[in-house]
Amino acid sequence: MTNQTARSSKKERYANLIPMEELHSEKDRLFPFPIYDKLRRESPVRYDPLRDCWDVFKYDDVQFVLKNPKLFSSKRGIQTESILTMDPPKHTKLRALVSRAFTPKAVKQLETRIKDVTAFLLQEARQKSTIDIIEDFAGPLPVIIIAEMLGAPIEDRHLIKTYSDVLVAGAKDSSDKAVADMVHNRRDGHAFLSDYFRDILSKRRAEPKEDLMTMLLQAEIDGEYLTEEQLIGFCILLLVAGNETTTNLIANAVRYLTEDSVVQQQVRQNTDNVANVIEETLRYYSPVQAIGRVATEDTELGGVFIKKGSSVISWIASANRDEDKFCKPDCFKIDRPSYPHLSFGFGIHFCLGAPLARLEANIALSSLLSMSACIEKAAHDEKLEAIPSPFVFGVKRLPVRITFK
């Protein structure tokens, strides 16, 4: 590695890029919650010199960071024209615009198509004795829906999913080379997807249609159209958020049902509980483990002084298991009276696509359960492998055996 590359990798050594040192083993990455519990009890707000950031683990502290954008800014890391990394007032105006695509009416219109795609994927799965939930079901479903929303050909779904995965992959370790390789891969992935969506936008300008892309092209904020970089940033965000969050939400729900046959039978006996299973999966196996912010001024959090410009990582997965907020937080309970989890964020950056993710997950799990008598691990000693991302929780593959009706 050249000196220039080394300097670049150190410059890019942002807390989003490398894992916590405590999560060093595959076992810990597959089930990190005991570590979060220990950190939440012993150091609820702590500085990590390796990642040069402050980690926040308590529910109230995490919520405070997320709901105070003036104090904890979203402008961080590698900058793009994405709504995810904007602050008000720019964020407010753009969010109001793009939220039109996720109104209850707009999402409801996708229901039939989601059911059709789900039925097709499960029909294909019937032909196999063992299926990989990720590759055969949880992965294709949201990518197909998103591809259609963005005007991408369905046959490109494997391609765009591959590059979407690259954008959330973390460094394999904390070495300069690993960080530099990861930064290089992310930049290549972002460049590819930028060119990909730039081409689609060009086609929509020449031939408008009644779809999301045309709506975004024709929309105005204060009399101005969105810039191409803003449009591309939103397309990439929707792709990545939909792919990673929804794929892992569905897969994590199935993973838990294979781990707990009692809960699986309870849900089969009353499918009205599917929605509760989805919400409890969001809390118990949160697809997004953490969210990064940057302190805009010297401040205090949890009795700890944080200097202006410091990276602050809010650990949602830890907050979702805070014993001061949830009764028996380490138990998967489908009869919780409420679900104040933070898995879709909080405040102005609450996930726009949450209604769509919930709809897709509910349809996917309901259909899977109604068409089967049993879902179990493909092998008792099946070894799962965690997704190589510091902030996304899920597995690379989830082989299961489904007894179809």
UniProtKB/Swiss-Prot annotation:
EC category name: oxidoreductase
Cofactors demanded by this protein: heme
Signal sequence range: none
Domain of life: Bacteria
Record-linked Pfam families: p450
GO molecular-function term, one example from the UniProt record: oxidoreductase activity, acting on paired donors, with incorporation or reduction of molecular oxygen
InterPro entries recorded: Cyt_P450, Cyt_P450_B, Cyt_P450_CS, Cyt_P450_sf
EC number: 1.14.-.-
Keywords assigned: Heme, Iron, Metal-binding, Monooxygenase, Oxidoreductase
Record: residues binding heme: C351
Keyword Nucleus listed: no
General function of this protein: Cytochromes P450 are a group of heme-thiolate monooxygenases. They oxidize a variety of structurally unrelated compounds, including steroids, fatty acids, and xenobiotics.
Family, per entry: Belongs to the cytochrome P450 family.
Name of the protein: Cytochrome P450 109
Biological source species: Bacillus spizizenii (strain ATCC 23059 / NRRL B-14472 / W23)
Lineage, broadest ranks: Bacteria, Bacillati, Bacillota, Bacilli, Bacillales
Gene: cyp109
